[in-house]
Design a protein with these regions (language model features):
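Catalytic cores of soluble, metal-dependent hydrolases
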Residues: 1-162
Length: 162
């Protein structure tokens, strides 16, 4: 899912329950005709829980009815389930834990890391200004794009911010 790396890179995650679809909100005064469905909210919540960075989950604009309360409980349960299944992956130089891929695209090298444990992907973002590096969560599709000489949008946005 394309949202997974975004959730994996978030410190704070908030869900506005008015973003749920009418059918999911169980309250015609809440919700949106094109809102997200409860399954997606639970999946996103689990991704947030699995993130090593996420330290806050907030649910906002709550409806006061029994069915909605059950949904909020499920969203929180999925977050806690994700926290329970967190894998601390931070030593990217450990060849026992990560595969390192260097891809040449349009005259620049992009370095990717893939966890041998979780099979999740990261890109190295080199910040030459302060001589430090950060690791940006990404998808295998970003790696495949780079192999086809297409610089991943995620990498471009991250390096533009640096």
């Amino acid at each position: 899912m394309k949202a997974e790396p975004i959730m994996r890179n978030s410190n704070i995650v908030g869900f506005d329950m008015k973003s749920l679809s009418f059918s999911a909100s169980f309250d015609q005064t809440q919700g949106s005709p094109n809102g997200i469905d409860p399954r997606l909210a639970c999946i996103l919540s689990k991704y947030a829980g699995q993130s090593n960075k996420t330290n806050f989950l907030g649910l906002f604009e709550l409806s006061n009815n029994k069915v909605s309360s059950k949904l909020y409980s499920e969203i929180i349960w999925y977050f806690l389930d994700g926290v329970d299944k967190r894998i601390i992956e931070s030593n990217f130089d450990d060849a026992q834990t990560f595969n390192k891929y260097i891809v040449q695209t349009s005259g620049r090298d992009i370095i990717f890391y893939k966890s041998k444990i979780s099979e999740k992907w990261w890109m190295l973002i080199d910040t030459s200004k302060n001589k430090s590096s950060s690791y940006l969560p990404c998808l295998e599709s970003d790696y495949l794009d780079a192999l086809n000489d297409n610089i991943p949008i995620r990498w471009l946005k991250a390096t533009k911010r640096v």
